[in-house]
Amino acid sequence: MCNRIISLFLLLFTGQVIALDLELTQGINSALPIAINSFGSDAAAQEIGNVIENDLTISGQFKIISGPQGANSQSSVSTLRQLGADSVVTGRVNQVGNRIEVSFTLADAVANGNILLTKTFQINANQVRALAHHISDEVYQKLTGERGIFSTRIAYISVQRNGGRSRYSLEVADADGHNPQSLLVSSEPIMSPSWSPNGKSISYVSFEKKKAEIFTVSVETGQRRLITSFPGINGAPAWSPDGRHLAVVLSKSGTPKIYDVDLSSGSMKQLTFGNSIDTEPRYSPDGRSLLFTSGRGGSPQVYRLSLADGQISRVTFEGNYNARASYTPDMKHIVMLHREDRQFNIGVQNTGGGPISNLTFSGLDESPSVSPNSRLVLYATRYQDRGVLGIVSIDGRIRMRLPAREGDVQEPAWSPYLS
């Protein structure tokens, strides 16, 4: 994988639906203890409870406390408090005609079971998982004061190999990896998925015509739009915060450079100049600057381009390879691919500068993408000789692995908030 990353930089970047299963590899001792009481015995009720438990585990902020009878049982708040729970979620699922009625209550086990939150919903059978994610968001926000990310989605590329043939698919799934859907399938590579700010479209690079082209695709309808198809490199699309522009990399004039494409008019403006390779642009959340990777200093490093005056400043100085950088949505950190001692890991640096800290340590990590609440980083890695996705907290204290059941998973992108 590392050799491929180097080759992709030098070149600019040069089936079956896969579901993902959560595996927690490292947690924290300060997680909030919470119990999820059974919502009932039928399939929908059990699924809701399981999804909520899984979501809160993914956040890394919660420790799940099991009742004395284990899963799929209900225990009193006082009993669960004795087992260590600070909060308790209790729910009920009923059939109302052809609809499903779901009620839930969040209680403060420390304060004698005081009710913190209670709500009732009516849904269709195909909305069970979506509602469970919504309940997780409500619980998370009530207990932490921050917006939950469980109703967001992730995009990634899955690759199925059979002999000498490969099948590439652009997938979209829930944030927990479930409910995957194929937006595109091709026998040629698909690369660099990037979400629009409203979460309705994804930009990507396609090689379906034996050359690189940049497209956008509607997540809802699958309708595609060709953005660029110049000779040479068309790569690394990234949306502006207002969704009106794409920053792209083109080699139509020779050396790969970064351009801005106005999506309404189709007009283009060149943003970087000179003889060095410039690639992997990412807008800052405030839209005032771009981070990008360039070899202008002799090795791949991260630079910042001011969109107001075109001034470029170097961001990274530690190590001889830093790339794929992006701001966290709160703009407190810059997350990047960092090479040290021939090991490729996910690194983080304060926006104001300073040392780069490794968040991962496998040496085979790439493609970091930050959650919309700035707390988690989704990335691609290798596990048991397969491409899988990992999640790490921005402080490095929580690590999870989402192993794919089949094939390889790569180039993940985390959506923005979708509502």
Curated annotation (Swiss-Prot):
<dbReference type="Pfam" id="PF07676">
    <property type="entry name" value="PD40"/>
</dbReference>
<comment type="subunit">
    <text>The Tol-Pal system is composed of five core proteins: the inner membrane proteins TolA, TolQ and TolR, the periplasmic protein TolB and the outer membrane protein Pal. They form a network linking the inner and outer membranes and the peptidoglycan layer.</text>
</comment>
<dbReference type="GO" id="GO:0051301">
    <property type="term" value="P:cell division"/>
</dbReference>
<keyword id="KW-0131">Cell cycle</keyword>
<dbReference type="InterPro" id="IPR007195">
    <property type="entry name" value="TolB_N"/>
</dbReference>
<dbReference type="InterPro" id="IPR011659">
    <property type="entry name" value="PD40"/>
</dbReference>
<feature type="signal peptide">
    <location>
        <begin position="1"/>
        <end position="19"/>
    </location>
</feature>
<keyword id="KW-0574">Periplasm</keyword>
<protein>
    <recommendedName>
        <fullName>Tol-Pal system protein TolB</fullName>
    </recommendedName>
</protein>
<keyword id="KW-0732">Signal</keyword>
<dbReference type="InterPro" id="IPR014167">
    <property type="entry name" value="Tol-Pal_TolB"/>
</dbReference>
<dbReference type="GO" id="GO:0042597">
    <property type="term" value="C:periplasmic space"/>
</dbReference>
<comment type="similarity">
    <text>Belongs to the TolB family.</text>
</comment>
<dbReference type="InterPro" id="IPR011042">
    <property type="entry name" value="6-blade_b-propeller_TolB-like"/>
</dbReference>
<comment type="function">
    <text>Part of the Tol-Pal system, which plays a role in outer membrane invagination during cell division and is important for maintaining outer membrane integrity.</text>
</comment>
<dbReference type="Pfam" id="PF04052">
    <property type="entry name" value="TolB_N"/>
</dbReference>
<keyword id="KW-0132">Cell division</keyword>
<dbReference type="GO" id="GO:0017038">
    <property type="term" value="P:protein import"/>
</dbReference>
